[in-house]
Amino acid sequence: MAMATRAIRYQLPSPRFRAPRCESSEPIKQIQIQQRPRGGDLAENGKIVLQPRLCTLRSYGSDMVIAKKDGGDGGGGGSDVELASPFFETLTDYIESSKKSQDFETISGRLAMIVFAVTVTEEIVTGNSLFKKLDVEGLSEAIGAGLAAMGCAAMFAWLTISRNRVGRIFTVSCNSFIDSLVDQIVDGLFYDTKPSDWSDDL
């Protein structure tokens, strides 16, 4: 029994098609990637990148530029100056003038205490009372001197207090005063007291 012979043909797979490389004369540009510094590098460089945060009312109000009494903005620039609330500006002037008046009242009170102490000391040492020698004419002179001192104190207070600016307190509407008061209360209760207290978690 004869067996038929078969020719076995092997065909190698054709290589994949490769796109021709286009060689250009232009140099290849190198891109430099800056790496973000780690926690150790931050301490050496001394630069800390803070995370974005929401601005509170107190921190926003701290950046407000307040005009001085002489018309300057304090920054040396000629741009428009954003004025603060007229109520708080008037209140500040009133507090300053009250401090000046309080100093005068303190000095006057101390002088009166010194005079009274000298009178009592003289009466104890010499035994002579100054009040027994006073008659109607002396009482009238003492009352006149007291009224003169009161008039001088009133004149001094009148000159130190800015009458026009203090009068603005009564012209401020009730709604604006309540709004500013509520704003200060809410800001003090629910927001940070100092922007410097913020700490960045590295």
Curated annotation (Swiss-Prot):
Molecular function terms, GO-annotated: chlorophyll binding
Location in the cell: Plastid, Chloroplast thylakoid membrane
Record's signal peptide: none
Lipid bilayer topology: Multi-pass membrane protein
Any single GO BP term: cellular response to high light intensity
Chief subcellular location: plastid
Keyword annotations: Chloroplast, Membrane, Photosynthesis, Photosystem II, Plastid, Thylakoid, Transit peptide, Transmembrane, Transmembrane helix
Ranges that cross the membrane: 111-131, 142-162
Interval spanned by the transit peptide: 1-60
Protein induction: Present at low levels under low light conditions, but accumulates under high-intensity light. Induced by UV-A illumination. Fades out upon wounding.
GO cellular component entries: chloroplast thylakoid membrane; photosystem II
Role this protein plays: May be involved in non-photochemical quenching, a process that maintains the balance between dissipation and utilization of light energy to minimize generation of oxidizing molecules, thereby protecting the plant against photo-oxidative damage. May play a photoprotective role in the thylakoid membrane in response to light stress.
Entry's family note: Belongs to the ELIP/psbS family.
Protein name in the entry: Stress enhanced protein 2, chloroplastic
Originating gene: SEP2
